[in-house]
Amino acid sequence: MCGIVGATSERRVTGILLEGLKRLEYRGYDSAGVAVIDADNHLKSVRRTGKVQELKDAIEQNPLDGTIGIAHTRWATHGGVTEANAHPHRSEDEIAVVHNGIIENHERLREELQAEGYVFNSQTDTEVIAHLIHHERKTHGDLLAAVKSAVRQLEGAYGTVVMDTQYPERLVVARSGSPLVIGVGIGENFVASDQLALLPVTRQFIYLEEGDVADINRTEIDIYDSEGNAVEREVVESDVSYDAGGKGQYRHFMLKEIYEQPIAVRNTLEGRLSEISVLDNAFGENAADILKDIEHVQIVACGTSYHAGMVARYWLESMANVSCNVEIASEFRYRKSYVHPNSLLVTISQSGETADTLAALRLSKKLGYKGSLTICNVGSSSMVRESDLAFLTRAGAEIGVASTKAFTTQLTGLLMLTLGIGKYRGMPEQQQEAVVHALQALPTKLEEAVSLADEIEELAQDFANKEHSLFLGRGNQYPIAMEGALKLKEISYIHAEAYAAGELKHGPLALIDEEMPVIVVAPNNDLLEKLKSNVEEVRARGGLMYVFADKNARFKGDDSLTVLNVCHCDEVIAPIVYTVPLQLLSYYVALIKGTDVDQPRNLAKSVTVE
């Protein structure tokens, strides 16, 4: 969600901070700010609502010069979208703080600090941290000790960076429930919430663990664990492309990432399949020791990743012969649930930092699961580090808030997991081999799906003035209908709902009229004839139908029924292939409506708060 950048250097850092914020815009935000300590040891800051460019323009009018500074993009939680609520927050013109997360006991701390004479200028929970650290520094006489004492009093999640005019070369950072990464330079060091922000200045990174506090200056980095012990954390060289944050020839990141799906899936498959099945080491060392005993799979995820899990349930139960439950992470973690014997906990997250999913993973360690596996796109993430097994999707950096290539590579990984478990559960070798061949054909099928873009762009014109829409699917295409509805509402702001087509008579049929477009994701299996009956029910009531169907399904269009013929593919990979036309439909509808495709209102890319 919010983005953090900090730097301590021998050179001026304002440009570094602004470039870092620019590279974090994809995370979603509504205001931004920068603070530096200048040559006279004065704290200077500029904050603005709106885009980073507006902040940059303001700084050009009132330059900020300093060799140490912090910066932030805010996504409002406590308090409205105002300049006063934007970060960095200050205390007594000495302490400046940026913070990601939510402090749950901020009201009590605010009252205590007000009683001590501190004056609050915002509605945020973050300003509490600034005043609390200032108060503790008066007691302890040192910034590091003050931060350690302050964070022990915080309840909730935080990733925070602090600077102090009394220590004008130091940044003190702390994380609990919100990720932070330190960038290691030569004569300079950095900190950020995402390594993408720092790729222009370093490729050497230290990923802080839960509960870590770090004291950073230009030449030294001292890290302390949650018990206060000095620790060494590994320095990792990033292989993420420097230009991963660029759009190239494409108008939007989302379109670029839709077109990248064939290569992203090809990369995800590379080196992980034999001729007859999936290699166990695709899921980590000693994966076979866990997978061979699995009798049940519990999938936990949020949003688009939850839809991927729902598709996987069909695969796992029909081919791998294991039972499977799929639950939204924010529900799973707050209820008592039954843990089946020999159960595998599977978390799915693009970032590996999704707050509720990460909390569910940590909860599972107390519940008796056989093991945990994460399907994730970020190898350095908390979920990867804290899971027993990990499948990395190799999608590359995904910048658009609406997930595209992360989703299709998650589905690819989940189908491979079905093979990985199924081969120990009696899945016939002939069936395994057929799935392998389908996966090997998948990148080419995705290229064919992307080639429908011009046809879908024309189709999108029909949706430009609609306020509502209905998506229908059956079998493993039902979750794809859900994903299509989510994409349309996310980026075009058209209200969209998805239903299993068999539920049409149980309520949704009441909504059908000539103003309600109905999008149908048609399976090419024994459910096809059932779905054709549902189509006729809608047509009989004057509904406008748009059917995405296998070109061999022989759907015939007319004035009330538009058919988009999708390339023929193996039934097992159809949910992945049919995802692409629905993504393109959402993109082109949003383009026509003039919405912010890459940064839709009120949404964030990485949801790192509850």
UniProtKB/Swiss-Prot annotation:
GO terms for cellular component: cytosol. Its EC number is 2.6.1.16. CDD domains: GFAT (cd00714), SIS_GlmS_GlmD_1 (cd05008), SIS_GlmS_GlmD_2 (cd05009). The keyword tRNA-binding does not apply. It catalyses: D-fructose 6-phosphate + L-glutamine = D-glucosamine 6-phosphate + L-glutamate. It is an enzyme of class 2 (transferase). It is found in: Cytoplasm. Its main location: cytoplasm. It holds the Pfam family SIS. The active site is at residues 2, 605. Residues 287-427, 459-600 form the SIS domain. Keywords: Aminotransferase, Cytoplasm, Glutamine amidotransferase, Repeat, Transferase. Residues 2-219 form the Glutamine amidotransferase type-2 domain. Homodimer. Catalyzes the first step in hexosamine metabolism, converting fructose-6P into glucosamine-6P using glutamine as a nitrogen source. PANTHER family: GLUCOSAMINE--FRUCTOSE-6-PHOSPHATE AMINOTRANSFERASE, ISOMERIZING, GLUTAMINE--FRUCTOSE-6-PHOSPHATE TRANSAMINASE (ISOMERIZING). This is Glutamine--fructose-6-phosphate aminotransferase [isomerizing]. It comes from Idiomarina loihiensis (strain ATCC BAA-735 / DSM 15497 / L2-TR). The lineage of its organism: Bacteria, Pseudomonadati, Pseudomonadota, Gammaproteobacteria, Alteromonadales.
